[in-house]
């Protein structure tokens, strides 16, 4: 994948990430229910580290899909209130919910193996 052909928004479609904002966050993510683990990808436009995750996610789509996550995404540079809600110290940040309960968060992209291990731990705590 060349730098010229990389479109960072491709990851949203590739992982079926639903956009959320501060107004609809609770209805979509927290009250969205079910036993599926929800992962909210908080990012910022032109954020270098966010784009590193997006590139990695496009390269490892299948592995990320196999984690059985319901994905959401929000640009916290545009939605500052949502960034404040989570007292972000940096992006990307991944916040996890299940059955209305916030289970944890990952700040920064740790790499695929570490991300998979963290998600597996959360899945096991069902």
Label each region the model flagged:
Residues 90, 95-126:
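Non-catalytic, surface beta->alpha helical segment in thiol-disulfide oxidoreductase systems
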Residues 47-50, 94:
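The canonical Cys-X-X-Cys-His
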Residues 17-22, 42-44, 61, 66-81:
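Thiol-based oxidoreductase modules, predominantly thioredoxin-like and allied folds used
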């Amino acid at each position: 994948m060349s730098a010229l052909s990389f479109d960072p928004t491709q990851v949203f479609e590739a992982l079926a990430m639903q956009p959320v904002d501060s107004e609809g966050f609770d209805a979509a993510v927290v009250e969205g229910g079910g036993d599926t683990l929800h992962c909210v990808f908080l990012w910022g436009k032109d954020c270098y580290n966010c784009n590193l995750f997006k590139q990695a996610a496009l390269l490892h789509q299948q592995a990320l899909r196999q984690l059985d996550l319901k994905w959401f995404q929000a640009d916290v540079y545009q939605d500052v209130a949502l960034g404040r809600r989570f007292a972000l110290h940096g992006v990307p940040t991944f916040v996890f919910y299940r059955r209305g309960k916030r289970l944890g968060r990952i700040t920064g992209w740790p790499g695929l193996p570490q991300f998979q291990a963290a998600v597996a731990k959360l899945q096991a705590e069902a």
